[in-house]
Regions:
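A short glycine/serine-rich beta->alpha loop
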Residues: 1-6, 39-48, 76, 122-126
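Short, hydrophobic/aliphatic alpha-helical segments
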Residues: 26-44
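Catalytic phosphate/nucleotide-handling subdomain of diverse soluble enzymes
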Residues: 51, 56, 60-66
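A broad structural signal for alpha-helix termini and local helix breaks/kinks
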Residues: 19, 23-26, 43, 64, ...
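Amphipathic alpha-helical interface segments
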Residues: 12-22, 57-59, 74-149
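Thiamine diphosphate
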Residues: 6-12
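Active-site nucleophile and cofactor-binding loops and adjacent substrate-binding regions
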Residues: 32, 47-52
Length: 149
């Protein structure tokens, strides 16, 4: 994870920041970071889609996503390309890591006291792989964008 001073960014924020540092993302700004701040831990700590995957998907959206100024055909083509790339990202992550949800990746439900205790214990022992997920997601997103690393 990326840290700046005492601030430690979550998996989603860290993934977006790493991708933006490697290849400037169009439209990446404080508002994107505000959105990403709620996607760590599988969306607000809920255990859903891994924040690293969410961050990479957001980066793909910034590059290939739609806005309200395209003609219908261009809108549809962009949407199709973005979804194809994002699904490739998600399939590859699940293939490499066996799960795509934080709950499965961590092996515990951090929304329960028992799960939170297990998570804290694994974190203290350095058994979490979240930094690896962030690095993987950055590499895969750049690969999908055809950016040389």
């Amino acid at each position: 994870m990326i840290s700046r001073g005492e601030v430690r960014f979550n998996c989603c924020e860290s993934t977006l920041m790493r991708i933006d540092e490697a290849h400037r993302l169009p439209g990446f700004d404080v508002n994107v970071m505000r959105i990403a701040s709620n996607f760590g831990g599988g969306v607000a700590g809920w255990g859903s889609v891994c924040g690293a995957v969410s961050g990479a998907a957001m980066a793909l959206g910034l590059v290939y996503g739609t806005s309200d100024d395209e003609a219908e055909r261009e809108f549809s083509e962009k949407r199709k390309q973005m979804r194809t790339l994002t699904q490739e990202l998600m399939n590859a992550f699940e293939e490499d890591w066996s799960h795509i949800n934080c709950y499965g990746l961590l092996g515990c439900n951090t929304r329960t006291p028992e799960g939170r205790a297990k998570y804290d214990e694994m974190k203290a022992k350095g058994l979490l792989h979240c930094d690896e997920y962030v690095q993987w997601a950055e590499r895969k997103a750049l690969e999908l964008m055809n950016i040389k690393q």
